[in-house]
């Protein structure tokens, strides 16, 4: 009885070892076989080959190594499954990025669109400086010319009046920034034209002509009048004889003799 049991156990062990040897045999594709299979999949559009196609493909691949029909079938099935999984991962990652961008858009200080960055990266001016508008007479705006990123900055400022106001007050932005390329010849740059400057210059020229005309008329009118001196030459004796003395009864006032004072009054009254 025991002998029969041992025989049965020996038969079971032999069957298990056979199954293990059979399952351990795996297909190890060569580089040439993988190259041909990928060429069929990507370039020839073979996704789900038929049984006849599998037989012909396996017969072709046996020239480069050991292979069976089931190996060809499973290779196509696994390749399609990996491709579908890759597409799902890409779609999930794209959806996650879109959700992150949408959530960041709800918080303005964390994210800005490229248009907003371009909008807020322009040159700004100091709100504490108040300059009159270019249309006001006799006032020129501030013109600043600079090039960014090249290490040089040239500024030209021309103004007559620029008042300083406390921060937060109203101001007029009269600053103009003009980018300059240092690699271009500066002599070939055409000068900028300012229409309001030409208007101010014309008005200033008209005012200058009016002032010159008034001065000429004034000089012409003065030449027709006779110049009279305050103290005529023939009255020098009166001035020389004029003396000042202190009188005790005058209350501290200085006065001259009566004759000299009368002569001085006649001289002064002779002028219109």
Curated annotation (Swiss-Prot):
PANTHER family: WUSCHEL-RELATED HOMEOBOX 1 (PTHR45940:SF2), WUSCHEL-RELATED HOMEOBOX 1-RELATED (PTHR45940). Pfam families: Homeodomain (PF00046). It is found in: Nucleus. Residues 1-11 have a biased composition (Basic and acidic residues). SMART domains: HOX. Residues 22-87 bind DNA. Belongs to the WUS homeobox family. GO terms for biological process: cell differentiation; flower development; plant organ development. Residues 1-24 are annotated as: Disordered. GO terms for cellular component: nucleus. This is Protein WUSCHEL. The keyword DNA-binding applies. Keywords: Developmental protein, Differentiation, DNA-binding, Flowering, Homeobox, Nucleus, Transcription, Transcription regulation. Transcription factor that plays a central role during developmental processes such as early embryogenesis and flowering, probably by regulating expression of specific genes. Required to specify stem cell identity in meristems, such as shoot apical meristem (SAM). May induce shoot stem cells activity in order to maintain the stem cell identity. InterPro entries: HD, Homeodomain-like_sf, WUSCHEL-like. Residues 12-24 have a biased composition (Polar residues). One of its GO terms (molecular function) is DNA binding. The keyword Nucleus applies.
